[in-house]
Amino acid sequence: MKIFDKLLNWYLSRNALPYWVILAIDIVICYLSGIFVFWMFFHGAVSPQHIVLLSKTIFMYMIFNLIGFRIFRTYSGIIRYSSFVDLQRVVLAMLLSLAVAEVMHYVVYHWNLEFVRLQGRQIAAMYLVATIGMMAFRIITKSLYDVLFNTDKGVRTLIYGVKDGGVGLAKSIRTDKPCKFLLKGFIAHDPSISGRILMGQKIYLVDDNLAERIKALKIKAVLVSPLQNARFRNDTKLQDILLNLGVQIFMSHAEKEWSKDDDYTKVQLKEISIEDLLPRDQINVDMDSIGNLLRNKKIMITGSAGSIGSEMVRQIAIYKPAELILIDQAETPQHNIRLMMQFEWPDIKAHTIVASISNYDRMEEIFKTYKPDYVFHAAAYKHVPMMENNPSESVQNNIWGTKVIADLSVKYGVKKFVMVSTDKAVNPTNVMGCSKRICEIYCQSLNKMINDQANGKPATQFVTTRFGNVLGSNGSVMPLFEKQIKAGGPVTVTDPNIIRFFMLIPEACKLVLEAGTHGGGGEIFVFDMGKPVKIADLAKRMIKLSGAKNIDIEYTGLRAGEKLYEEVLSTTENTLPSFHEKIRIAEVREYDYNEVNKQIEALIALSHTYDDMAIVEKMKEIVPEYVSNNSKYSVLDNK
């Protein structure tokens, strides 16, 4: 018995049996089925000479079986993972073999060859028993494997979603050995299927009693069906239930990448991050139009080593540009971009250049050398408190740097210039936001001026994109919260009522590319950022998600220049619909280029005096709606 157990464990612990072994087992089953049927029909009266002749007859029929096995490839599956489809293949193979056998039966005996003459019903019985035997072999093997290797040590798990991929996900975790997740039921919103049994497990309704059921079942993990990702993100009630109970939540990749034909046995699950819990809609863009614009073109990206810029590099590289001219003054991050391009896109000619956008001579040499077709301008200082204390740098880098790149784009015939702006440019309350608003004004006025003078000739088109906070960026609160949680707290939030719009970096960059593709010049495109999020709620969720205990939230008060909430439109702006449901066009006043340029030149000259008050006063003159908040510059608003 011990030898049998060892053999059984050896067999079941193998990765997979070779095809020929499965085929050999099926042939043996067919042979024994023939002997058994013959023995039954003749009530056990089988002489030795009959056995020899019968074996010869059975081998003839087994040749017909091999035809069916080959056509339907019954031997190609992994037995321990057998499914209804595998059993169906066995049945179809045996039906085909039976049909061939019945035809050949009359041919063989018409020629009076030396075979045992079987009746039609005996042949049918032989094939029926063989089919049952082959199916039993697969079912028993699968059952033994599940019993021997299925352990209660797996994490007790519920699956969120039934109809849309939930069953496929359940099958995938059951075939995963050793067992990591132990299926204990499903969660659904549909009352009509609540309480039903699926795959031997109960379906539970998302209601007020769900928390108690999860406690009773001792659930430690919930897996979200791939096609239910979006719904789960918006189900904050269920998220709170799970987080409060300390249940781990796992999701797979984006639902748009799945279809009904997908192989769910290859689902790659990951424990959720805070980004997965923020309500947001899936963003789709016109990839064909973007590809037609960028393919085989020379593309310049400023700020290429930053959060937005580096993602722009990745997304644009997909469309196979002729060259990428990547500009950033941060040496080490730029070096990392160079390595990324070498390893991930070695076929693309990428020039990773360390340079400051505010160095006119250096930038002109770059434009003259590489002659870009399109410019995506993402370089900027963006930290509000830092720029509040260093307004001269905000002017010299953000405003002067933008002017340099914009002017050179016109001079060297760039087709389109796309600037990345921020919602902090709307009704600005801080230096950084005001500097970006001045950049918007300059690009718009320059676009109008050169197109008025073009007389129908092609001219550089200037497009501005405006959006809010992006998750995981260098300036995001999330990395700070993560560090504070790991350190044991407290987590610092400026105000309990402060809210922000959030978007994933890849989603924001997709919309930048979409706007850049379709923009005709002069527009400010405003992105729909979805639902605003309370920063305090974000902090609480991150604490719960980490599993940390006794971490407090400390409210420190608004920082200089900080708003309680951000806007994407000023009080004097309206929007028009655009080519994309997530993108609106801001209706803004037009500015005279000569006047704007004169004002900016004066501001830039003033920035070299490093007189903070004088610099900010001039910025307020250019942008009258700039009203400082909780800042030393508030005194200037009372003049």
Label each PLM-derived region with a short phrase.
Residues 3-4, 233-298, 410:
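Flexible, Lys/Arg-rich cytosolic regulatory linkers and terminal tails that connect or flank
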Residues 31, 35, 40, 44-46, ...:
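A solvent-exposed beta-alpha-beta segment
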Residues 354-374:
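Conserved Rossmann-fold cofactor-binding substructure of NAD(P)-dependent oxidoreductases
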Residues 1-153, 181, 194-197, 220, ...:
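Signature of alpha-helical transmembrane segments in polytopic membrane proteins
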Residues 299-317:
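N-terminal Rossmann NAD(P)H-binding glycine-rich loop of SDR-like oxidoreductase domains
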Residues 246, 289-293, 445-639:
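Strand-loop microenvironment adjacent to phosphate/nucleotide-handling motifs in alpha/beta enzyme folds
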Residues 245, 260-261, 377, 381-441, ...:
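Conserved Rossmann-fold NAD(P)-dependent oxidoreductase catalytic core, especially the SDR/UDP-sugar
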Residues 214, 218-220, 321-322, 367-376, ...:
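Proline-aspartate-enriched helix->loop->beta-strand connector
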